[in-house]
Amino acid sequence: MLTKRIVAALDIKEGRVVKGVQFENIRDAGDPVELAKKYEKDGVDEIVFLDITASKEKRNILKNLVEEIAKELFIPFTVGGGLKTVEQMVEIIKCGADKVFINSAAVENPNLIKESSKIIGSSNVVVAIDAKKDVESEKYYVYTHGGSKKTDLDAVEWARKCQELGAGELLVTSMNTDGVKKGYDLNLTKQIVDAVEIPVIASGGAGEVKDFIDVFQIGADAALAASIFHYGIYTAKDLKIQLKKVGINVRL
């Protein structure tokens, strides 16, 4: 059985780590370099760095900060936020990131997935999908620009398309559950896991050990969390000990 991964998210705004609830009410959570080092020490398998306002503000990612964090880490480090071209993605890899993720730019130009996977390798291209459930149709729609713009893309169909175009992994965030700490959106995650063969990272809503157990049992390859680590509710090691007890294969 493949090892399940625990991923810590660093949402960056103005050079600081922040955390919101359902993509709003942002509050400060600390220094990114210090937190990255701490999370690695605490047993996290990967770190995802998201410059949360780069896309909205139409500016480039904070490269100096990426370099600074990359220097300190030995675990895989994925970076995204506002990346629009293959050149920018290559630049971020040169700064020390292991993988890059794209979101809004992939929706606007799906060919970017194809081009980037050819140049930096499919396994280094992650497509992030921010999705929200439509109450009337019960369908999940893709949102872009930090969750501020609704598209008419069905999230499950878009996930399939991303795989076809060469994405190596999907980072799926449910906007309905983000930051609420009441559990991952199992319905959305399962629909996407069943639709694709590439790894799926579930994101949005982790609050306790049971949430990780649930999401791994429906087939997620990795589970991303932010609030529970930032506010010291659990360390990755605590989590993994509990997961191991119920037979989930994790790296201790």
Swiss-Prot record:
<comment type="subunit">
    <text>Heterodimer of HisH and HisF.</text>
</comment>
<comment type="pathway">
    <text>Amino-acid biosynthesis; L-histidine biosynthesis; L-histidine from 5-phospho-alpha-D-ribose 1-diphosphate: step 5/9.</text>
</comment>
<dbReference type="InterPro" id="IPR011060">
    <property type="entry name" value="RibuloseP-bd_barrel"/>
</dbReference>
<dbReference type="GO" id="GO:0000105">
    <property type="term" value="P:L-histidine biosynthetic process"/>
</dbReference>
<protein>
    <recommendedName>
        <fullName>Imidazole glycerol phosphate synthase subunit HisF</fullName>
        <ecNumber>4.3.2.10</ecNumber>
    </recommendedName>
</protein>
<keyword id="KW-0963">Cytoplasm</keyword>
<keyword id="KW-0028">Amino-acid biosynthesis</keyword>
<dbReference type="Pfam" id="PF00977">
    <property type="entry name" value="His_biosynth"/>
</dbReference>
<dbReference type="GO" id="GO:0000107">
    <property type="term" value="F:imidazoleglycerol-phosphate synthase activity"/>
</dbReference>
<keyword id="KW-0456">Lyase</keyword>
<dbReference type="InterPro" id="IPR006062">
    <property type="entry name" value="His_biosynth"/>
</dbReference>
<dbReference type="GO" id="GO:0005737">
    <property type="term" value="C:cytoplasm"/>
</dbReference>
<comment type="similarity">
    <text>Belongs to the HisA/HisF family.</text>
</comment>
<dbReference type="InterPro" id="IPR050064">
    <property type="entry name" value="IGPS_HisA/HisF"/>
</dbReference>
<comment type="function">
    <text>IGPS catalyzes the conversion of PRFAR and glutamine to IGP, AICAR and glutamate. The HisF subunit catalyzes the cyclization activity that produces IGP and AICAR from PRFAR using the ammonia provided by the HisH subunit.</text>
</comment>
<dbReference type="InterPro" id="IPR004651">
    <property type="entry name" value="HisF"/>
</dbReference>
<keyword id="KW-0368">Histidine biosynthesis</keyword>
<feature type="active site">
    <location>
        <position position="130"/>
    </location>
</feature>
<dbReference type="GO" id="GO:0016829">
    <property type="term" value="F:lyase activity"/>
</dbReference>
<feature type="active site">
    <location>
        <position position="11"/>
    </location>
</feature>
<dbReference type="InterPro" id="IPR013785">
    <property type="entry name" value="Aldolase_TIM"/>
</dbReference>
